[in-house]
Each structure stands twice: as C-alpha cells, then as structure tokens.
Amino acid sequence: MAKIKKHTPPPGWKNPLAPQQPLASARWLLGGVAATVGLAAVCVYITFCLLFWQGQWQLVFKPSRTVTATPATAGMKFDEISFDATETGILQLNGWWIPAQPNAPYATDTLLLLHDGSGSLSDSLPQLQALHTLGINVFAFDYRGFGKSLDVHPSEATTYEDADAAWRYLTDTRHLSPSRIVLDGVGLGAAIAAETARRHQQAPALILEDPLPPVLDSLHFDARTHILPIRLLFHDRFDPTETLARLRTPKLMVYSAHQAAGRYYAMAAEPKQQAIIANGQDHLNSLRSFLGKYLPGA
C-alpha cells in the first residue's frame, strides 16, 4: 500500500475554512459611531457660526428699500442729492438737503442727521420736520443698504464710511465750513455720530438722541446668541463709550427717563449737557438752547 505523503502548507498560509476572528468589536463600532456623530456636530456648529457671521447685520439693521414720502409731503422744500461716486462713477448714497429760510436763525449752519438704522429716510420725516423748525439747514441721507442708496448689506464699517462721505459732500461739494456742521445721531445713529465727531473734530457740536446701548449688550437678550461665541464672531459693536469719554466736542444727550443712556452722559468728557425727556415732552427747546450756546456767531 502506498504511503500518503503529508502536505506542509507554505509559511503564512491560513486555512480559509478555519474559524475567523470577529472583524470588529462592539466597543470599536460604538466608538466609531460616536466619533462620526461628534465630527458631524462640530461641522454643524462651525456652519452655524459661519452663517451667523455672514448674517449678523440682520440683528443690528432693519433696512427698507422703500421711500414712501419726501419732505415735500410735509410741505418742505428740498433737493434730492446723490453723492459719493465709486471709481466706476456709480453714486452710492442718496439724501435730502432741506434748506433753512434765508433769514432763519441758523441759515449759515447745517445739521447732519444720522438716522437709527431702520427703515429709510421716509421714517425720519417727522424728525426732519421738527429740526427744520429750528431754522437750520438739514442734510439727511440713507446709508448703503437703505432707501435709494446702493443695495449692499450694511455694517458698522460701511455706516462710518457713509457718514464720512456725507461730511465730505458738505465740506468739499457744498463748500461748507466744518465749524458750521452740527452732527446729530438718533438711536444707532448716535454711535455713528460720535465716531464721525471723533474723525472730524472741527464740528462745533454733537447731539445724541435716544442713544442705544452697545450692540453686544443688547444681544444678550436674544436667546439665539447664547450658544455662540458672540464676542469672537460679532464685528458690529457700535459702542461709543470710549469715544465719548475722550471727545472734547460739546455734546447734548437727549433721552427718555427710562433709558440706560444716562451712563453715556456720566462717562462723557466735558463740555456736555443732557435733556431727559419724559411723558412725551418736546425736546426742541433743549436743542435751541444748545445750538445757541455752541454755534459760532449764533
């Protein structure tokens, strides 16, 4: 009988029919799932942060592209002005020049109004009408992103640029003396007016009406912002505190008794005045007194 020779497999050979080791343990699978879910959560959070960073302007500004009324609606003469041309010749900003009567008390002076960052110039019409009764030329305009001005997303930086452009229009195009231009900011515009006064300290006076608290302070009341690193992401601060503490331009702060704007007044450098308005009182007398004190030759 022939002897069967035993076959020796080559080194490294494994029998495919032999029992196999499990491909993965349950712990490994759970770890992989957890890592995937964690990575997805991080990606979602980063995406949320990026979306917030891109759309944060909507928490600050409430622009309208509609101009429903003009000074003529209120019986005032005015000129519609387009100014601040780009390198390609596009006029970016649109505003209204409302002249004072030739024999008015401040016929050679101008008040540059910086509105509150909501609506359009039409929404400022009641205030423009009141300011016109002071007997001073009034120039008001819409920031980019508002009214008939260039359609872009506004930001703190662009509003400061637009205020500078309005100042240049008055001094370079209309050839007005900087010492005859009073800055008046309302709401959010108060911070813009303060920054403009810092950049153009030839202005004889600065009026801040109903100044808002810094934007970051206001955002703490918005629950959507509690899960995000707001101070890292938010670049629109509108905080005039430090500027007002150093600025030597005469200031008038007009605000309601219930507002927190009094802290601006407490920290502001002299000279300064305040008018606390309660129960719908008229603040025009305070404005008249302030203008009479600080406008040259008034």
For every predicted segment, state its role.
Residues 262-298:
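C-terminal catalytic histidine-bearing segment of alpha/beta-hydrolase fold enzymes
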Residues 257-261:
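Acidic catalytic loop of the alpha/beta-hydrolase fold
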Residues 1-29:
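N-terminal Lys/Arg-rich, disordered targeting/topogenic segments
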Residues 40-85:
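An N-terminal hydrophobic leader/cap segment in hydrolases
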Residues 88-170:
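Membrane-embedded segments
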Residues 169-173, 178-226, 235:
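Primarily recognizes the serine-hydrolase "nucleophile elbow" in alpha/beta-hydrolase
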Residues 115-117, 227-234:
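Short, flexible loop segments at the rims of nucleotide/cofactor-binding pockets, characterized by
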Residues 246-248, 252-256:
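Short beta-strand/loop motif that positions the catalytic acidic residue
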